Amino acid sequence: MKAWLAAQWQCEQQNQAYVLASIVALQGSSPRGVGSKILVTKDKQFDSIGGGHLEYKAIAQAREMLLQGGQTEIIDYPLGASLGQCCGGRVTLMFEVFSVAKMSVVVFGAG
């Protein structure tokens, strides 16, 4: 089982908010492929989207979203000198915020 998936299950069981950041698009060279994910809580992270400054920026963005109550966001990162990465490609990340709100189901009008 992927580390992020096990962490997601654990967060859901403990009603802990988290952000799931996923690589949704690539251009050129990058350290990880489309579909790679990292799960970020207020004090931990699970799995990897490639390490380095890209991952550092992604973790910082995710934690800011947790603090501010952000919504799903897509951000494009060039993997060049500005991130201190030599891959030279571009990575597009989707950040999905999962809060601790419990969902309930109400059924009515069944007859």
Where in the sequence are the language-model features?
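Segments forming oxygen-rich coordination pockets for charged ligands
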Residues: 1-111
